[in-house]
Amino acid sequence: MSQQKGKKSRINVEIYGQQYSVVGDESTSHIRMVAAIVDDKMRELNAKNPSLDTSRLAVLTAVNVIHDYIKLKEEHEKLKESMRQKGME
């Protein structure tokens, strides 16, 4: 859920052992959740690819997250189309 228009949240988060100051339109709890998911994904991928440096690990994480996003978006579109065909929308 977005905060009031124009109101930004600023929060410090830790991702893969590094501190980042993040500013966003969402609540601080949402920003913390996003940071935790990124951290978890990086650690998961590092466990499978321990020889990757942090930069390559970050790129691999981004590729994996975008892959998941695209698959979910495609699934969402299929469900919307199915609902449209059934007259449920």
From Swiss-Prot:
- What are the annotated disulfide bridges? none
Give the main location.
Answer: cytoplasm
GO biological process per UniProt: division septum assembly; FtsZ-dependent cytokinesis; septin ring assembly
**Keyword set includes Disulfide bond:** no
Question: Keywords assigned by UniProt?
Answer: Cell cycle, Cell division, Coiled coil, Cytoplasm, Septation
- Gene3D superfamilies, A to Z: 6.10.250.790
Coiled-coil annotated residue ranges, if any: 64-86
The record's section on InterPro entries has:
Bac_CellDiv_Activator (IPR053712), Cell_div_ZapA-like (IPR007838), Cell_div_ZapA-like_sf (IPR036192), Cell_div_ZapA_firmicutes (IPR023688)
One CC-aspect GO term: cell division site
SUPFAM superfamilies, per the entry: Cell division protein ZapA-like
Q: Which domain of life is it from?
A: Bacteria
| Record bears the keyword Cell cycle | yes
**Locations listed in the record:** Cytoplasm
The Swiss-Prot or TrEMBL record describes its family as follows: Belongs to the ZapA family. Type 2 subfamily.
- Subunit notes for this chain? Homodimer. Interacts with FtsZ.
State its role. Activator of cell division through the inhibition of FtsZ GTPase activity, therefore promoting FtsZ assembly into bundles of protofilaments necessary for the formation of the division Z ring. It is recruited early at mid-cell but it is not essential for cell division.
Q: What is this protein called?
A: Cell division protein ZapA
